[in-house]
Amino acid sequence: MSKQLPQDFVMGGATAAYQVEGATKEDGKGRVLWDDFLDKQGRFKPDPAADFYHRYDEDLALAEKYGHQVIRVSIAWSRIFPDGAGEVEPRGVAFYHKLFADCAAHHIEPFVTLHHFDTPERLHEAGDWLSQEMLDDFVAYAKFCFEEFSEVKYWITINEPTSMAVQQYTTGTFPPAESGRFDKTFQAEHNQMVAHARIVNLYKSMQLGGQIGIVHALQTVYPYSDSAVDHHAAELQDALENRLYLDGTLAGEYHQETLALVKEILDANHQPMFQSTPQEMKAIDEAAHQLDFVGVNNYFSKWLRAYHGKSETIHNGDGTKGSSVARLQGVGEEKLPDGIETTDWDWSIYPRGMYDILMRIHNDYPLVPVTYVTENGIGLKESLPENATPDTVIEDPKRIDYVKKYLSAMADAIHDGANVKGYFIWSLQDQFSWTNGYSKRYGLFFVDFPTQNRYIKQSAEWFKSVSETHIIPD
């Protein structure tokens, strides 16, 4: 049966500066944590990505043509402050003014993220989110952006704090590529929430009239079996990846049960508890009571079973199905039940997880007034057909099927009371992936990276229909 979305529901595509812009050495842009890391790996480069730095008008024109009312973009901090602080690069400032003006020209509202995994290199070397200097410079950068880019009405402080901290210090897939350091993970998580809170409180004090939120990666965690030990493993995983953030940003405090689970993980790894101050917790509480919205990035769900060995993680970075391993000391082991479909990158396809996380926010965190689904989509191995012409439409039925199921689950959550106001598909166009390079394609628009030519995918036409009719077909 088809399902109806509210008439004021907005839809669009999502991007991130480092993944789409390219031009990493142009117009005075400073280096970021990824530049040296990717150079040393030698697997793939962030240039040209989707060359959005030069082709943003082409992509925004496509977005408008295919029914998008909104877009997620991020500001590359190192385009504004090449060193993270100090001298401003006017060419970077001018670029974002042009980008936002072009959004307006195409009748698309930008939701603008201040930090999307791209810490300036100097601040990364100073400790990244473990450094007080980083926090202070981030707040100063945010203040500059709020004053400079008054045309922006929707701000996002940080994209996926959990992904940043866990992949930097627990699984080691993001630079500095440390693993098993749960103490650093939780401290970085807390510090990100402090920075987020300071920025929310600053923005509200400036009375600029816009809205501000945060984006979380929220993958619903289920027990692998009905056993008590598997239920507890799921609770531990949830505390690591979801619960601490939800508490801090949406409740304004860390609930005692959450802290007990965090301490259990740290004790099992013989590592100390993260540090916080009363002043920091006051800022966190104040921000939670002023937050305008939360963004939910949901792609897959996890199932956890009890595990008592050493941590072992293998990241599936090339689409070899079944190659990923995730076992964390003091937490548990990820194990998919029989019958759960996965992508080539071992991400489960489980729309019920979308429903459950949206209802959890609605039921457990009533302070936040509005939710957006700020990322959802499926990465596929796709190629340009031989003899393709500019009019070629690339068939991607798997993407349509995936998005239809997740949109349907989201519509059910709206029906049951969740105040979800919009959906951003990941991604607008094919992009560069942090850990997969160019092999994993998410876009509604196919990018032939050697030529940078754009081609329409069938999913873009389907997306346009849903956006314009507000009806999710059978």
From Swiss-Prot:
D-galactose 6-phosphate binds at residues 19, 116, 159-160, 297, 433-434, 440, 442. InterPro entries: 6P-beta-galactosidase, Glyco_hydro_1, Glyco_hydro_1_AS, Glyco_hydro_1_N_CS, Glycoside_hydrolase_SF. It catalyses: a 6-phospho-beta-D-galactoside + H2O = D-galactose 6-phosphate + an alcohol. One of its GO terms (molecular function) is beta-glucosidase activity. Pfam families: Glyco_hydro_1. It is an enzyme of class 3 (hydrolase). GO terms for cellular component: cytosol. One of its GO terms (biological process) is lactose catabolic process via tagatose-6-phosphate. Its EC number is 3.2.1.85. The active site is at residues 160, 375. The keyword Hydrolase applies. Pathway: Carbohydrate metabolism; lactose degradation; D-galactose 6-phosphate and beta-D-glucose from lactose 6-phosphate: step 1/1. Keywords: Glycosidase, Hydrolase. Belongs to the glycosyl hydrolase 1 family. This is 6-phospho-beta-galactosidase. It comes from Lacticaseibacillus casei (Lactobacillus casei). The gene is lacG.
